[in-house]
Amino acid sequence: MDTAGKVIKCKAAVLWGTNQPFSIEDIEVAPPKAKEVRVKILATGICGTDDHVIKGTMVSKFPVIVGHEAVGIVESVGEEVTTVRPGDKVIPLFLPQCRECNPCRNPEGNLCIRSDLTGRGVLADGTTRFTCKGKPVQHFMNTSTFTEYTVLDESSVAKIDAEAPPEKACLIGCGFSTGYGAAVKTAKVSPGSTCAVFGLGGVGLSVVMGCKAAGASRIIGIDINKDKFQKALDVGATECINPRDFTKPISEVLSDMTGNTVQYTFEVIGRLETMVDALSSCHMNYGTSVVVGAPPSAKMLSYDPMLLFTGRTWKGCVFGGWKSRDDVPKLVTEFLEKKFDLGQLITHTLPFHNISEGFELLYSGQSIRTVLTF
């Protein structure tokens, strides 16, 4: 492309501090350096993790460009890039896969050491490619997709099928893959089992879809927003409950409902209290509980160790346990083969400049997933 090797001026949604609104700014995006890729974003989803930065519950430096769930087209590549080329359709990866570190080389690992889940805010060489009003702007989780153009390390880019529709396939960059994988890959839900899913947002519904795909016979959705129940039933939940409708602890409610046979529970909210509730709700001898929701930074969890001593398994899950560069293209292929329907998760599609409206839909509970298009 004729922009290769040049600074690109474009629009981006910049956060200048916590609890501040997005500001649509003119920014400059530098050319990619060695082993880097510059991508033109086509569509990007709004995820609750982005809101953690706004609220200050996830550590970040400012100013920053958040967003991490997207599909784009490679505009140009730096030296030594071998896996993608200009014109390729790609998904940015908030969880990279360098294929060299211990977690990448271990068949059970996926948390690459190049991951930036702690707010470092720069690329692998320690610098940023974004500038706004003469100031450097931080990257977010190796991605930064709330911008017309972004720069990523090659290890944070997965080439996908050119036929994949960006406004749907972008969900594979985070929300869908995280939830679906939590059920089929991390928990390894068994056929005929009973599952309980705490939180019925986009990721929680993806967990429900994964439980159904794995053959669970009973899938109980749990949320304080009853407006989400019908969508949960549509994607595979067998019943839904609101904890506020009961005076008993939710673990006792689930035990009464199922005869104490809940084998798998999933916390998809990111609240410390519900993490313990989910653990308490699975069977004490053979139950597995998976933490899927991103926890708040610098918070400590307190729980009764007897919950684990009696035989429960407590697991964490980042990006559904998938190895990103290897598995994302496969998930896109499965989507194109209609093995799952991403359209069920999308409630709103808005132009990028309406990003603030998209977050208001999230806050009000009206949206499952809002996708921004460019």
Curated annotation (Swiss-Prot):
GO MF, one annotated term: aldehyde oxidase activity
Binding site for Zn(2+) 2: C98, C101, C104, C112
Gene that produces this protein: Adh7
Origin superkingdom: Eukaryota
Gene3D superfamilies: Medium-chain alcohol dehydrogenases, catalytic domain, NAD(P)-binding Rossmann-like Domain
Record-stated family: Belongs to the zinc-containing alcohol dehydrogenase family. Class-IV subfamily.
Cofactor note: Binds 2 Zn(2+) ions per subunit.
Intracellular or extracellular location(s): Cytoplasm
Amino-acid positions noted as binding Zn(2+) 1 in the UniProt annotation, renumbered to this chain: C47, H68, C174
Protein activity control: Retinol oxidation is inhibited by the detergent Tween 80. Ethanol inhibits both all-trans-retinol and 9-cis-retinol oxidation. 13-cis-retinol is an effective competitive inhibitor of the 9-cis-retinol oxidation. All-trans-retinoic acid is a powerful inhibitor of all-trans-retinol oxidation. 13-cis-retinoic acid is a powerful inhibitor of all-trans-retinol oxidation. Cimetidine and ranitidine inhibited ethanol oxidation.
Record's function text: Catalyzes the NAD-dependent oxidation of all-trans-retinol, alcohol, aldehyde and omega-hydroxy fatty acids and their derivatives. Oxidizes preferentially all trans-retinol, all-trans-4-hydroxyretinol, 9-cis-retinol, 2-hexenol, and long chain omega-hydroxy fatty acids such as juniperic acid. In vitro can also catalyze the NADH-dependent reduction of all-trans-retinal and aldehydes and their derivatives. Reduces preferentially all trans-retinal, all-trans-4-oxoretinal and hexanal. Catalyzes in the oxidative direction with higher efficiency.
Keyword flag Metal-binding: yes
GO CC field: cytosol
Modified residues (N-acetylmethionine): M1
Residues at which NAD(+) binds: G199, L200, G201, G202, V203, G204, D223, K228, V292, G293, A294, R369
Keywords noted in UniProt: Acetylation, Cytoplasm, Lipid metabolism, Metal-binding, NAD, Oxidoreductase, Zinc
Pfam family, one: ADH_N
Protein name, as recorded: All-trans-retinol dehydrogenase [NAD(+)] ADH7
Tissue specificity field: Preferentially expressed in stomach.
Known EC number: 1.1.1.105, 1.1.1.1, 1.1.1.66
Cofactor section: Zn(2+)
Catalytic activity annotation: a primary alcohol + NAD(+) = an aldehyde + NADH + H(+); 10-hydroxydecanoate + NAD(+) = 10-oxodecanoate + NADH + H(+); all-trans-retinol + NAD(+) = all-trans-retinal + NADH + H(+); 9-cis-retinol + NAD(+) = 9-cis-retinal + NADH + H(+)
